[in-house]
Amino acid sequence: MDNLFGRLLTRQELGDDFEHLPANTVTFPGMTLTNKCAICNRCGTSSLLQTVKLEIAAYFCPECLQLGRVRSDELLYHLPQQIFSPQDTLLWNGQLTPYQAEVSRALITAIDQKSQILVHAVTGAGKTEMIYAAVSSIISSGGTVGIATPRTDVARELHTRLSRDFSIPISLLHAESEPYFPTPLVISTTHQLLRFRHAFVLLIIDEVDAFPFADNDALYFAAEQSRKMTSTLIYLTATSTDKLDKLVKRGQLEKVSLSRRFHGNPLVVPKVIFSSSEKLIYHLIKKQRETGFPLLIFAPVIAFGRLFSERLRSLFPDESIGFVASTSKDRADEIERFRQGQLTILISTTILERGVTFPKVDVFVIQSHHRLFTKSSLIQIAGRVGRSPERPTGLVYFFSCGLN
């Protein structure tokens, strides 16, 4: 029963716990009906009645269907969030740079003021370490913290890092994760926020510009609904969005910026190579492999990436080559093998464009003119290089047939 506190769940999600719900359980209709629309009370989406009508004279929400169907003739169930015992949990004893410390202090001020704040920092600035003091301050006062990110791989990476740097068990939630358990610190994909209501004193959205969170009204609704009425919201990004920039200009959102990496070295500038010659690409890969540094290669689509990886295996039989995409069942294992040096070359779609760190890596982008490689995406991809103080430089090659 403890795993229900702070949650917003359907009857199906409750399972056997439904028979033992306490008296203080709060219920909501799954949808609110108007003359023309059905409004989902889990994700806030409004749909025209005629487009979402079921044969049983009820309505459903298509927007959050992947989390289980919400219907107008069924209820949503909520138990108010529990209070946790105050505890000191921060194990990290590293030192922030003066610029990082300034951002960290701004986050503490935002917590004191129960306000919203945007942290706009370059890739490799050390955003994760900058939130530690804020997270620790909430947990040490008995509060709850949620850290959400649009991408599953980023959520896994954050969970690994914070599990190392905090002494409490951390619940990790995504489509393939273990079930939720009660804890003051939750790391999840942004879709999982739809299953929380008034749960977090502090909510942090990392990589706020990434798909599927960016410009997704349902996920912004989830971010608002998942945190307590009086709480703090922190947005983290290296590439802000028009929506957030407008809020900053209107004075509705505070913004702090950090334009340098934690090790003080400048960002690595990509080199654009206007050529589609496979011979040139293979030549530069061969030259890069002579350095011994790991090579991360981005492909625009899954089919091309898979074929390209097979071609590289035939051309470079002495290299250990992997391929990952959103459909890869062994994705987490392959990423870890690359991080540990068991793979020397990793080909990936844009799933690894952000939120992951591979020390001393070089990056090649094939068909960088492809429409899926947006400005934001290419900035994030280039930011994978030079993140390690042991090697703050590196290669970033954009192979392109022209500017898009």
Which stretches of residues belong to each language-model region?
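Post-DEXD/H (motif II) to motif III coupling segment of the RecA-like Helicase ATP-binding lobe
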Residues: 198-272
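Hydrophobic positions on the alpha1 helix immediately C-terminal to the Walker A/P-loop
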Residues: 130-134
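Conserved helicase motor
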Residues: 149-157, 161, 170-181, 188-195, ...
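Conserved RecA-like helicase motor core of SF1/SF2 enzymes
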Residues: 207-210, 335, 339-392, 400-403
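Conserved strand-helix element at the start of the C-terminal RecA-like helicase core
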Residues: 119-128, 138, 143-158, 285-313
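N-terminal pre-P-loop "Q-motif" helix
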Residues: 92-115
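Interdomain "pre-motor" coupling segment immediately N-terminal to P-loop NTPase/helicase cores
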Residues: 33-83
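Conserved segment of the helicase C-terminal RecA-like domain
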Residues: 228-243, 382-404
